[in-house]
Amino acid sequence: MLQQAERRIPPFRRRKSTPHEQRLSHHSSNNNNNIDSMSKAIAQYTEDGVHAVFEQSGESGRSFNYSESIRIASESVPEQQITAYLVKIQRGGFIQPFGSMIAVDEPSFRILGYSDNARDMLGITPQSVPSLDDKNDAAFALGPQSVPSLDDKNDAAFALGTDVRALFTHSSALLLEKAFSAREISLMNPIWIHSRTSGKPFYGILHRIDVGIVIDLEPARTEDPALSIAGAVQSQEALVRAISQLQSLPSADVKLLCDTVVESVRELTGYDRVMVYKFHEDEHGEVVSESKRPDLEPYIGLHYPATDIPQASRFLFKQNRVRMIVDCHASAVRVVQDEALVQPLCLVGSTLGAPHGCHAQYMANMGSIASLVMAVIINGNDEEGVGGRSSMRLWGLVVCHHTSARCIPFPLRYACEFLMQAFGLQLNMELQLAAQSLEKRVLRTQTLLCDMLLRDSPTGIVTQSPSIMDLVKCDGAALYFQGNYYPLGVTPTEAQIRDIIEWLLAFHGDSTGLSTDSLGDAGYPGLPRLGMQFVGWQVAYITEKDFLFWFRSHTAKEIKWGGAKLILRTRMMGQRMHPLSSFKAFLEVVKSRSLPWENAEMDAIHSLQLILRDSFKDAEHRNSKAVVDPHVSEQELQGVDELSSVAREMVRLIETATAPIFAVDVDGHVNGWNAKVSELTGLPVEEAMGKSLVHDLVFKESEETVNKLLSREEDKNVETKMRTFGKEHQNKAAFLVVNACSSKHFTNNVVGVCFVGQNVTGQKIVMHKFINIQGDYKAIVHSPNPLIPPIFASDDNTCCLEWNTAMEKLDPSNENVTVGGVDVIGKMLVGEVFGSCCQLKGSDSITKFMIVLHNALGGQDTDKFPFSFLDRHGKYVQTFLTANKRVNMEGQIIGAFCFLQIMSPELQQALKAQRQQEKEFLGRMKELAYICQGVKKPLSGIRFTNSLLEATSLTNEQKQFLETSVACEKQMLKIIRDVDLESIEDGSLELEKGEFLLGNVINAVVSQVILLLRERNLQLIRDIPEEIKTLAVYGDQLRIQQVLSDFLLNIVRYAPSPDGWVEIHVRPRIKQISDGLTLLHAEFRMVCPGEGLPPELIQDMFNNSRWGTQEGLGLSMSRKILKLMNGEVQYIREAERCYFYVLLELPVTRRSSKKC
């Protein structure tokens, strides 16, 4: 519909998903969503590949029905046809006629290809250029040839193999040489160059391709204000105003943000219509904001099929984020290239790429002649990133249309690209806030529902407010509980629900639920009887007989047309490519689908599902919990000693910290004062204690700021001016930038405020002298004194005015870390100094730096802005940037001062180590996810095999073997599904309790070490009472198996070998607590002779924060899981043996209680 890149007609609908593909997978919803999104994109490539349909129809004279093409069933497309389509998209061989292009070999400057109009644009007469038909002419030879003289205009030959520098003036040739040598050539754009023959000026826009460098030449007017420094600054100021307007908008309003950006773009560019076009999760698009001429019909609210903008075009938008069509009726210009090249020249990064015929026809049908399209890029999902970096995602497009031919000069397009980067950053924050807001709302609703479940029966979640309909956006919801039907909103009848339940149990009985936006595609045969108001379903299984339902109607009901309906006109346009026919085609596709269910909604449903399951189980075993729960408080008392030890260690660290740290009580009196604060203020700790922070220790100008912090308003990076004491500090001040946080008692009551600071006194003194023009200006700026921070300054045109000695040598300990000095004076700080000389990390960094600089020129200071760049030697320099305005004697702003605070080597090393750890952690997590996913399939096969064996006639011994195999298989599946160490660490792991035989657990645990025992030639001694094998208890069987097997496996692993032994003792004690409640007090001992486990492994096991080995991690997690089950473990070393001593209490079921 709106894409600027080459577009294709969307002829085919996607393949229907199988029922299995519609199943809900709660444990990997995000990952599955990414895979599903990728699958949709790949599937669309196939659909896009039938690109020749429209082109062939035009060549043959046959009619092409656009709307009908959407409804054609998906067919197999030959791979060659898809490849040809992608090649045509990227290497089409034609450009738009408003400019010309030349492709050049990078090292030799020889021309590899050019557009047919290049001669005319450069003013080179045909007489000076040999004919293309003369194959033998030396001027077209592809080997080495003499380069025409740069001093003789009449020698300017234009042909393949010519030195491109000969076509331009001497100064232009020097600019080209400089640009070719740049590491990031795009930062040099645009280059103002002149034709050597005609003297005409051009914007030279350069980018690298696989065979060399492409030079796009766009004619420039000599009076164009963008060519002057003042004009460039004026464009930058207009851009910064637009960006500042975006940043000043109230948060949590994406619609307002989009409305503002279309108004700003229209004001900057002057197009008749500007739209924000958003891509939805299912790849289709929607116009969500629009600014237009009053007489134009609106497109806001229109939705379009995913194939209206092909995946190849979306990929191109990530590479070249701004694309322009000047006149869709203009004939494209052919590109001539060297026959020795293997494939056509790549025009992906070209500003001149010609649109395909279908897109030109589409624009003509909608009355649009010119267009400008800009990509909106935001952060993608972390797991999609490479090398630990977040991936980037194409969120949508900002699309400009004009009813007549229109050409926007490159500098203005470049400014719009910066605006899109700022828009993307702001949009990313707004989307994160919206996601957090949704999550909080869902959590709040879940909390209220949980409260209902605790106080009332499960039916309260449908009979009271809030209800399950408030949990997710839906048209109706229902609870089917104990054979009764409780509907809410628009719902199917009870008979229809019963029919659905039968179908679910028959075809989806082995899943935890169903999630689909099309019940028909999920395979339900009775959809015609239900109607279109129930096409989207969410089903959560609570038990085998109890279910939760949510319903959504078809998407077409939600889609609204922003202007006149124009139904008759739509019918007339059904066969033409037009927004209305795209809209009609989209409605045809989605009339049997609902809005997709979002990940947050599915997570909320899954959480409620688990809560209800536990609620049902807890209702059955309420008495057991009443007895077991008091032991939690005993464990909390046992942890007091550990907490006290940790507290003492924290106090010691605070007292010896190199950062100033102090604290006050609720009355504002000092009750904590470390050595660093004493050093900075000259006030010993014994004198500081009890003083009032506001009245005794800070200057008057900081009193209001400190009072706010004492009113329990937690804040970061707050500057305070502290008083100093003693002769050495007399009449001086200490400046601290502090983070303030509340200090809380163990009862969670606020008892004071803690301040963690950073000393910025030296920097503040220098800044004060600069801003007030105190002292000797030159002496301070260029002083080699190490106390002087790196400083650079700009004039009001953002050109470099000062660059002090500390800037030239950022790290005194490293003589090689230099970024230049005299040669940066006079250059643009944005683009030339920081961009070309000192490379920044990506275009987003350039945008942020430009905003900081212009804010300072506008009187808005910036403090502690993270600023990193590569120096000339490729060394990564990490700093904090402070930018302040420069004023003259009359108080007028004449520029900006910038101060850099260098991160210490220790901090850099720590950050580097942290990034490396995060990278390794991400790699490990991906490996773990891959292993977990891969293991599930063979486990499923084992489960199936076991189920077949269960159906056969087996001896008692064979049945025992089978039960052990099933228990081990379930234990492994449990571990794989719940790889959540954080929930184990914080004690929130969900236990799945049930009745089981303790003997089965012992058999499963022993079976897991038998092979290792044989391998190490060890004897296993069992001391297990016979009665324990048939004892039925209540608890989490699989977690108990996991814990005991881990302890026993480590004993076997470190028992002396060969001819050693391992012994397992089990000692049960039955306690009668009350009528109907019996507890088993079980003692397990896993024993081996000798020294046993290494001491460092035991340290890992009992260390709460760090571990050094995989075995240590496993033991630590097992200990914590055991603690969650009200158990405990000790490792005891005696003279000749060592062993794990495990205590565990489990409720005995009534069946076993009667036997006892």
UniProtKB/Swiss-Prot annotation:
Domain named Histidine kinase: residues: 930-1150
SMART domains: GAF, HATPase_c, HisKA, PAS
Record-linked InterPro entries: GAF, GAF-like_dom_sf, HATPase_C_sf, His_kinase_dom, HisK_dim/P_dom, PAS, PAS-like_dom_sf, PAS_2
PTM statement from Swiss-Prot or TrEMBL: Contains one covalently linked phytochromobilin chromophore.
PROSITE patterns membership: HIS_KIN (PS50109), PAS (PS50112), PHYTOCHROME_1 (PS00245), PHYTOCHROME_2 (PS50046)
Sequence ranges assigned to domain PAS in this UniProt record: 646-717, 776-853
Listed Pfam families: GAF, HATPase_c, HisKA, PAS, PAS_2, PHY
Record flagged with keyword Transcription: yes
Record domain GAF: where: 253-431
Entry keyword annotation includes Transcription: yes
GO terms for biological process, alphabetical: detection of visible light; red, far-red light phototransduction; regulation of DNA-templated transcription
SUPFAM superfamilies in alphabetical order: ATPase domain of HSP90 chaperone/DNA topoisomerase II/histidine kinase, GAF domain-like, PYP-like sensor domain (PAS domain)
GO CC annotations, alphabetized: nucleus
GO MF term set: phosphorelay sensor kinase activity; photoreceptor activity; protein homodimerization activity
Family, as annotated: Belongs to the phytochrome family.
Function: Regulatory photoreceptor which exists in two forms that are reversibly interconvertible by light: the Pr form that absorbs maximally in the red region of the spectrum and the Pfr form that absorbs maximally in the far-red region. Photoconversion of Pr to Pfr induces an array of morphogenic responses, whereas reconversion of Pfr to Pr cancels the induction of those responses. Pfr controls the expression of a number of nuclear genes including those encoding the small subunit of ribulose-bisphosphate carboxylase, chlorophyll A/B binding protein, protochlorophyllide reductase, rRNA, etc.
Protein's name according to its UniProt entry: Phytochrome B
